[in-house]
Every structure is written in structure tokens, then in C-alpha cells.
Regions:
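Terminal "cap-and-tail" regions of soluble proteins that handle hydrophobic small molecules
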Residues: 1-21, 105-184
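A structural signal for short hydrophobic beta-strand segments in well-ordered beta-sheet cores
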Residues: 17, 83, 99-101
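Short beta-edge strand/loop motif at the mouth of beta-sheet-based domains
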Residues: 19-28, 34, 38, 45-89, ...
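Solvent-exposed residues in well-ordered beta-strands and their adjoining turns
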Residues: 31-35, 71, 102, 113-117
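Short, surface-exposed beta-strand-loop junctions and turns on beta-sheet-rich folds
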Residues: 47, 76, 98-102, 116-118
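Short beta-strand segments
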Residues: 77-81, 97, 108
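Short, solvent-exposed secondary-structure boundary/capping segments
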Residues: 90-96
């Protein structure tokens, strides 16, 4: 891993929400400079997910009907999910997450739909924003360490993104701030 010290997330962009009561759907779009097949592998292979995603999977997400245990980084909670749609390399769907991959000249438009409790929508947007940055660097061959969970919340730039996304979405950010990282 390299370059983490030089990484800083850009401004909040490419996101919107669909509001439905307490459950809101985050829609985040990112254009990546990599072909859909390469992006698909990063979305479905547990070894790749471990490098960039905010969760670990104990198996491949590439097959409809596959039952996979997901563990969100920094939590002890394990949830079992079933892949409900897998059309490589176009659409992947499981639990409350849907990915669409659209080929572009020289890359892929990746769209994420993630249903999130409205109180945490800005957190989700900030977390996925950073995860997409880490994914892009991984696919480019210049990986940096995964920035997720409580470590992600302590990462410089995360709180700024939460504030920017909350303002964009017309949502109040949660009034909880992560504790500073422990010094060794």
C-alpha cells in the first residue's frame, strides 16, 4: 500500500437521495477509468472487496442465489445476504445494495443504490465516496489502504464530506463525532 499520506478526498459530488420515510436511498455515481469486467471483479471477489469496500464478504457475490456473510468493517455484526441479481458485468444486487456498471469510452460508469436510514445518509455518502476513491486507486495499480469503519470516520476529510453531503441532501448529520485515533 502506498500514498495514503497524500490522499485527500475531493468535494462531495455525484450523489443524490430518494426519500421514502425513514429509509432513504443513496444514489452515488462515479466514472472509473477501468473496463466493466475489471470493476465487476472488484465488486464481487472477496479478496478485492477486502482492499477497498466497507465490508468483508466470506464468498463471491458473482452468482445469483449465493448466500454470503457480510461483516461491515469495525463491527462484530455478521449479516447473511443472498445475491438476488448478478448479470456480469452489468448489474449486481444483494440485500439493500444495487450496483450498475455502464461501459463508457475508456472506462465504466459505476452507480450504487444503497438504502440507508435517513439519519445516516450523509455518513453513507461520505464513506462510499472515500471507498470509491480507494477502489479507483486499487484498479489503477496504485493502491492505498482501505479507509472504512471507525478508521474511516477518523480520516481527515470524512467529516467535511459528511457536512457537504448533509447540506446537499437537506439532512442533518448525526450529532455524534468519532473519537480521535489513539496514539501509540
Amino acid at each position: 500500500m502506498n500514498d495514503l499520506a497524500q490522499y485527500a478526498p475531493g468535494p462531495a459530488s455525484g450523489a443524490q437521495v430518494r426519500k421514502d420515510g425513514e429509509k432513504w436511498t443513496l444514489i452515488l455515481v462515479r466514472e472509473l477509468r477501468h473496463p466493466p469486467a475489471k470493476v465487476w471483479e472488484a465488486l464481487t471477489d472477496p479478496l478485492h472487496l477486502r482492499e477497498w469496500a466497507p465490508f468483508d464478504a466470506n464468498g463471491s457475490l458473482a452468482t445469483v442465489g449465493a448466500t454470503v456473510k457480510l461483516t461491515w468493517v469495525g463491527t462484530a455484526n455478521v449479516s447473511e445476504t443472498r445475491v438476488t441479481r448478478a448479470d456480469p458485468p452489468r448489474v449486481l444486487e444483494f440485500h439493500d445494495i444495487r450496483w450498475e456498471l455502464e461501459p463508457l469510452a475508456g472506462g465504466t460508469r459505476l452507480t450504487l443504490w444503497h438504502s440507508i436510514d435517513r439519519r445516516f445518509i450523509a455518513w453513507g455518502a461520505a464513506g462510499w465516496h472515500i471507498a470509491f476513491d480507494v477502489l479507483d486507486r486499487l484498479l489503477s495499480g496504485t493502491p492505498i489502504a482501505r479507509i472504512a469503519g471507525r478508521d474511516g470516520m477518523r480520516f481527515e476529510g470524512w467529516q467535511r464530506l459528511v457536512t457537504e453531503y448533509a447540506k446537499q441532501f437537506g439532512a442533518d448529520p448525526p450529532n455524534w463525532a468519532p473519537k480521535p485515533a489513539q496514539k501509540s
